[in-house]
Structure formats: C-alpha cells, structure tokens
Amino acid sequence: MLKQQVGVIGMAVMGRNLALNIESKKYTVSIFNRTQSVTEEVINNNKEKKIFPYFSIKDFVNSLRKPRCILLMVKSGQPTDETIQFILPYLNKGDILIDGGNTFYKDSIRRSNDLMKCGINFIGMGVSGGELGALNGPSIMPGGSREAYDLVSSMLKKISAKFKNEPCVSYIGPNGAGHYVKMIHNGIEYGDMQLISESYFILKNVLNMKNEELSNTFSQWNKGELNSYLIEITKNIFLKKEKDGIHYLIDSILDHAEDKGTGKWISQDALELHEPLSLITESVFARYLSSLKDQRLIASKILKGPILKCISSQNKELFVEEVRRALYLGKIISYAQGFSQLKKASEKYSWNLQYGKIAKIFRAGCIIRADFLERITDAFKSNNVTNLLLTPYFSEISNKYEKSLRYITSYAIKYGIPVPTFASAISYYDNYRTMSSSANLIQAQRDYFGAHTYRRTDKKGYFHTNWLTKKEL
C-alpha cells in the first residue's frame, strides 16, 4: 500500500490551507482532526485532491512514509502538548514533528529537548501570512533540528512565499529560534499597526480628511518608502462600504482593538532581557487602553483637554508629508528595537541568528512585508550591526526625518490627540542619542536609600557614599 509523504494534524483554517498548499506542490497528504466531521468536510470540499483522511491517530501515523513528517497545526500551549503525547507512542526514532502553531518560544525549547531524548526530530516553525498566506505561500521561520530541516527544506521552499523567485524560508537556528523570530515578527506587526492607526487618526482629525481622501493618501504613500502590505490593505479598508452602498464600514467599527495574547510575549521577554522595546510595548498597551471603552466614555465627559486646531488648506500637503515622514521613522525605530532584541536573545541562547536572512524571509508572504526590508537586508550584510539606527541608510533617514517625528508628536500632544507609539518613538530616539543622560541621579538615589553603589566617570570600580550630613545623623 502506498504511503503518503506528509501528515497534517489540525484542520482549522491554517492547517487546512497548509495541507492544500502542500498537496498543490505534488505531495500526497494524510490529514487528521480530533473532530471527525471537520476532516470529512475538508475531504468533501477537495475530492479531486491527493489528500487522504484518517480517523484514528494510529492509522494516520501508519499511513506515512518513514521517516515520517508530521505538521501540527493545533492551538498553542496545552493542546499542542496533549497532541504530542497522543501521537508519540506511534512514532519511531528519526521521525519529524513540526509545530507550525503560534507557539511561545520557550515551549519550543522544552519540546525540542524532550523529544530529542526520544529520538524524535522537532522543528518549531513560525508561519506568517494568515489564511491566504497558508494557502498561497506564507513566510516560514523554522527552528530546531538542523538535520530535520535539511530533510524537509525542499518541501518548505516549495510551499513558501517567493520574493523575486527566492523562497521566503531559511533555517533560523536551534530549538526555539524559529518561534522566537515569529514572536518578534508579531511584535513589529503590533507596532506597525498602531503607528498607522495614529497616522490615520491625525489625518482624520487635524485635516478633516474623509475616507476617500484617506484612501488616496495611503495609496500615494504605498508608491514610495512606505510600500507595504499593511499600507496597501489600509487604503482598501477606507473604501469598503456597508451593504447599503452608502456608508463606510470603518466608521461603524468599534474602537476596541482586541488581541490573542501573543503581543505580550515579546514585551515580557524584553523585560527579561533588559531590552528597551518601548515602541512595540506601547502598541500592546494601546490595545489594552482601547479596550476600556466604557471608562473612556465617562472620562471624555470629565477630563478636560485642549481645543483641536486644524491645519489650513494651504498647509495641508506639507502636513501630510510631515505625517508620512514621522510614520516612516517610527516604523524604522520599531524594527530597530525588534532586531536589537533578536540580537540579545541570540546571544543569550547561542542561536547565531543571521539577521539579514531573517529580513529576507519577511519580504513576501507575511503581514509585515515591506519594500524597506531590502534596506534591512543590506544593513545586515555585516552581522555585527549593533542597532539599525547606526547603519548608513537608516541613520541618514533618521537625521532627515527626526524633525517631522518631533513636530507631529508635539502637535498631537499639544492638541490632545493620543499618539502613544509616535511619542515612544521620539523618546527612544532622543534617549538613544543622548551621550550623558539623567540616569546618574537615579544611581545616586539608589545608593542613598539602598546602598546599591554606583560607578564614576573618572574612576573604575563601584563606590558607595554616606549621603547623610552629620546634622541629619
């Protein structure tokens, strides 16, 4: 009996579409889902395809060629652990388990170590692009066993997105490296989305832009430095109308930005690494604050603010350009923070991440795909870059656009428009470029009340001072 080449467990939309993607590249696929009716639905809708259903995990595993290649597309956390334990008794040494879920990287580190003891090859694989990306070609970030990756790399390259015919997949590094990169991707996505929404809010309120004009503005931006998937879909969103064909949908959507909880992972990890991920973390907090809709309604009637001053029509074009520049620099700072955290994690876990290759993976198929990733790839031709802001292209843009970021942020603050990520961006920029900061006072305070010591600018070593005068003693 002929056996299938790949197995997929989990037939929710991502697993289903990845199975279809794999089959479309001339692979035979076995599928299994805990709920039998879901498996039957997939088969009934794809009868002509070489996708074979199984309704017991034993039959599913036995249907696969050795070494078996099994892709897990189930909910992250405990459901993934339970699925692994469910399938483990039927596996043989050398088989490959790929976790393609939205998994926390520390779980992937643990699973990689545990499965290695059993002789099972584990790949923790970040997948970005949503349901359409899964079907047509996602950005893929595999980490874990290098031996296992080499066995499945041909398939992953075939199913991945392509940028100028180059597959958007590359081996990331050991154990949890792939899912860590996906976590950074998600954090940058949060930052991008919040920066764009703040830009929209400024244009709408300061310039009184209507939806068609907003769409035209974002369309123009998408032809230049800001060309990206998120800018592209934003221009489309503004034009979407209700079923009545009259009212715009965007105006009826509740301003409560939800999240699946993955955004907090990167911020929590930044705290563990002592990494100043301020912009991305602020974008997470902005979603949390948006969820306080009932409180905000009350606060809007109690708490006072300035009267908004609109820009005159003759200065409109100049103001739009200032917003564009501020958005671009904010985006650069968001990526700079994300890649700086990648570098810190790579050092901690000895992953030896290749940052230029990672930027290449993001160029197509994923949510944060953007033209300027080519610039990041170029910047990381030397893998020893400390911070993107210090590289030639990005430092030049930063020096050119910082006045715009400063102007738009201060204008928004002056007139009561919330811009948490713009404010965070310029604050990070100024802190990062400040040679002598206010932190010397903090160290003095820490030594005063806690004898935590301090270092000096003129001598080496750590020092403690008795800060109390004789009178105070």
Swiss-Prot record:
One of its GO terms (molecular function) is phosphogluconate dehydrogenase (decarboxylating) activity. SMART domains: 6PGD. Pathway: Carbohydrate degradation; pentose phosphate pathway; D-ribulose 5-phosphate from D-glucose 6-phosphate (oxidative stage): step 3/3. Its EC number is 1.1.1.44. The active site is at 182 (proton acceptor), 189 (proton donor). Substrate binds at residues 102, 128-130, 185-186, 190, 260, 287, 446, 452. Keywords: Gluconate utilization, NADP, Oxidoreductase, Pentose shunt. Homodimer. Catalyzes the oxidative decarboxylation of 6-phosphogluconate to ribulose 5-phosphate and CO(2), with concomitant reduction of NADP to NADPH. NCBIfam families: gnd (TIGR00873), PRK09287.1 (NF006765). This is 6-phosphogluconate dehydrogenase, decarboxylating. It comes from Buchnera aphidicola subsp. Schizaphis graminum (strain Sg). The lineage of its organism: Bacteria, Pseudomonadati, Pseudomonadota, Gammaproteobacteria, Enterobacterales.
